[in-house]
């Protein structure tokens, strides 16, 4: 696996898998699989993509930006106990391939969901809320920021 030169050589084992393109393919596959399942249930294309976008947004918000610490014992356990999963990725180095993928994926989902609904205003605003909830915590100025002391 080719690593970015900006990434430290000793990575937190709890998040090192995120840098793998295979992980990105699997991540994309999970969203597409959910879309296929929803289509199989008879939901319209627009509703199915909105649900995929919401599921993705809610799950990634809690997994990446709410839960702190390392789920498995590692050398970085004490260093990461106050960091969210997102903050632990690539040992806090910004603008790596993994972070770019995870930043752009919800934006792509937003455009797919909005476009499949024909740019309907109601769907646009519903998906915009999810986009903000998913992308805003990933921005560099939000690194280690806990709003209103929540989750500190």
Positions of the model-derived regions?
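Alpha-helical transmembrane segments and their membrane-interface exit regions
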Residues: 55-63, 130-140
